[in-house]
């Protein structure tokens, strides 16, 4: 459908369903090692979707991967020092509701490294935490988002390896 000046009208799906399972855990392997796995399995469907007077039957809902999993491995060699290895996998997804092949975002896997050191001074602050984060340490090239303009895909590629530093002051 078009509006009064010829632009496509965006509309909600009339019938859809989302069904999924999310699981996360925190497992202490020892005083120094903790593992925190998580995963999501889901089915996200538009049912009997009709667009531009065409019936597209049952298709995946846009931007809804059916598989996501992650893991955090935390190593604490000292009570106030934590080194975390973070991994995340996101399954394929589509940028539109009709599963157009040009609208497919491929799955991706990224790995980050986080180091946090906490100081507990005796005055002014309850604690000071210094944090360093290296994102995408394997320097993977991936796309996590984008949009479609008609049948043409436009992507938002993500940064390669990048670094962040932080300082948290607690009173």
Name these PLM-found stretches.
Residues 19-23, 67-71, 109-115, 161-167:
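Hydrophobic, lipid-facing positions within transmembrane beta-strands of outer-membrane proteins
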Residues 45-50, 115-121:
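Short regulatory "switch" loops immediately downstream of catalytic or recognition motifs
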Residues 2-10, 42, 48-60, 100-105, ...:
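Flexible, surface-exposed loop regions and adjacent strand-edge segments
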Residues 4-6, 14-18, 28, 60-66, ...:
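Transmembrane beta-barrel outer-membrane domains
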Residues 34-36, 103-115, 134-136:
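Conserved long hydrophobic alpha-helices within structured protein cores
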């Amino acid at each position: 459908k078009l509006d009064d000046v010829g632009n496509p009208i965006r509309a909600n799906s009339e019938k859809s369903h989302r069904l999924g399972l999310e699981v996360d855990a925190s497992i202490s392997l020892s005083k120094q090692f903790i593992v925190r796995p998580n995963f999501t399995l889901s089915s996200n469907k538009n049912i009997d979707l009709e667009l531009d007077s065409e019936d597209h039957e049952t298709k995946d809902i846009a931007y809804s991967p059916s598989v996501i999993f992650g893991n955090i491995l935390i190593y604490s060699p000292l009570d106030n020092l934590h080194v975390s290895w973070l991994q995340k996998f996101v399954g394929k997804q589509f940028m539109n509701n009709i599963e157009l092949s040009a609208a497919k975002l491929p799955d991706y896997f990224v790995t980050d490294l986080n180091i946090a050191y906490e100081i507990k001074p005796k005055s002014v602050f309850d604690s000071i935490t210094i944090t360093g984060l290296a994102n995408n340490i394997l320097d993977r090239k991936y796309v996590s988002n984008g949009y479609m303009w008609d049948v043409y895909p436009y992507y938002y590629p993500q940064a390669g390896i990048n670094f962040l530093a932080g300082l948290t002051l607690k009173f």
